[in-house]
């Protein structure tokens, strides 16, 4: 099964990063992944998701410092920048995937607020199933 992981927020990004690490170790090439966050430092802490696959959103609103635990702001930033997130997903290639998996922590703001916004957009655009892991 070919899966496109979207790590959303700090927790989601770290978990997606671990999936990519395991995929590399097994040389399976079954996973594609990006990480989306409002905090620049969280994105820089990833080890296995490539730099071009780390998407910083909300720069005009939170200037790369994250939204803390404010999931309302996380949802707003995601809504405002949903087109850039979808473009990032499209540019990584989706023609051969079997499913999308959005991974997010439920205690912060970026992942818990933004992941429902992204899930709705993915379901509207693609035929592949969209799963959430929180």
Regions found by a protein language model. Name each.
Residues 1-134:
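Tubulin/FtsZ superfamily GTPase core signature
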């Amino acid at each position: 099964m070919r899966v496109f992981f979207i790590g959303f927020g700090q927790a989601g990004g770290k978990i997606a990063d671990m999936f990519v690490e395991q995929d590399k170790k097994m040389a399976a090439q079954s996973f594609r992944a990006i990480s989306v966050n409002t905090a620049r430092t969280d994105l820089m802490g990833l080890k296995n998701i490539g730099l071009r696959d780390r998407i910083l959103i909300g720069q005009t609103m939170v200037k790369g410092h994250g939204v803390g635990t404010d999931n309302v702001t996380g949802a707003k930033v995601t809504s405002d920048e949903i087109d850039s997130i979808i473009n990032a997903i499209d540019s990584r290639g989706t023609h051969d995937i079997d499913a999308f998996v959005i991974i997010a922590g439920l205690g912060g703001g970026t992942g818990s607020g933004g992941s429902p916004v992204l899930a709705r957009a993915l379901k509207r655009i693609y035929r592949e199933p969209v799963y959430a892991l929180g």
